[in-house]
C-alpha cells in the first residue's frame, strides 16, 4: 500500500498515523483488509485488482481511471470489483472512467460511453450505445443486445451462418451513418 502513498515500494518511508488510518480505510472499503499480511504474489487476480484500487484511494482521488479492470478475472472476482466501483461512485461520488472491451459485467454501473468510430471519439449515453447495429459496427462482428426477463442487458455475438459471415463491417458508407451522431438523430426521429 506504500505505493499509493509514496509512489514507490522501495526505501525507507515514514508513515504517519493518519496515513496508516487512510490505508486501513481504503483496504476495508475494497474488502481486502483481511489480506494485509499477504504478499501481493500470493493474491488472486481479483484481489490484486482491489489492492490497486485501494492504493489509488489513499490519495483521495476525484477521478479513477481503469484500463480493462475485469480482464482475466473469474466471474466472482469481476463481480467483487464491479461492486467496489459501484460503491465508489454512489458512496464517495467518485467519477470512474473505464476502458473495456467486454461491457457485460460493467453495464449496470455505466452511464455513458466514449467510443472510437473511424478514428474519431464520440460520447453517448449507454441507452444509445446499446444498439445492435452500432455495436456490430464498433466490434466488427455481428452482435445482439439481449434483455433478460429481469431487465438485465448483455451484449453477445450473433451466431453466424457459414455463408452469412461478414468479413469487414467498416466500409466507408457504413461509417458515415454513425458520424456526428447522425445515426442517433435518425433513430430518435423514427421513434
Regions found by a protein language model. Name each.
Residues 39-43, 47:
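Conserved ABC ATPase signature
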Residues 64-68:
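Catalytic Walker B motif of ABC-type/P-loop ATPase nucleotide-binding domains
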Residues 2, 16-35, 41:
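Conserved ABC ATPase "signature" region
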